[in-house]
């Protein structure tokens, strides 16, 4: 049955055409149209304007160039860690989207395709163009896409048909999410693309989840002596929603995922040179003891907040150097001991002890009151 011109799908495409005309032909901002919800998609207009500023026109033909053989080899070698971490995840993702008319594309941090998966119709030239290893899908090469937008905006995006810059790419609908490595830097991106497919904005959530799985694989690939799975109290532990903090044998942070960076402000974006004692308000050696408990424990932060931590050893890890603390001491008692020590060093001045610890006086009284 033909689709009504008044169907939501047709109205959406008509709205996109209006916005394109406003921005690309009239040179006005899309905001001038007062289009519902366009404000949170202003990144599309920014990308369009970058393309226009570079002298590109929407009706220009695209060639979807592949890098020369030597450059492809260099790209593959440079991204071997990402490929190794991503391939098992891509295999699972490919099965998950097998009946969706969308396929998966993995690119490096520059938008060059390094792997693909899912239901790719090799008889369709439009699919083949995008899924060749080494094809450059950056904004510079093919304009506004979910790939270029995810890399530029550093966040998950959804792009439908004419929201792409070039007419040649207006047949595609794409969801994209950036991939961040253990050092907090963008390592690449994951894309889901359909050709003349129904709009599926929920794929933005799906691609973000699978991107998180790849990020976790990257974090776990770094050699480490202890892995800390962290989450807030009351939340489960043991899946891709965990924050991951990996330590060496001296308690130094060697790898983290993006979730952990959001929970532990000291790590910040791009910061990796930190010691676990800067993160957790307890002797760091006790984290290794927690791995022998094989169950989550509550660990205090210097802010006064508490994280739930599941410490896991990758094998027979040598015990860290002794700090003189009893390794059998429950972690909640360590927290109270640290507070008592701060109060003693402040000569009983609870206000000063709270300031040093970065917590409230009420927290100090509460923690001490339970002993």
State each model region's role:
Residues 119-122, 126, 264-272:
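PAS/PAS-like sensory domain cap-loop motif
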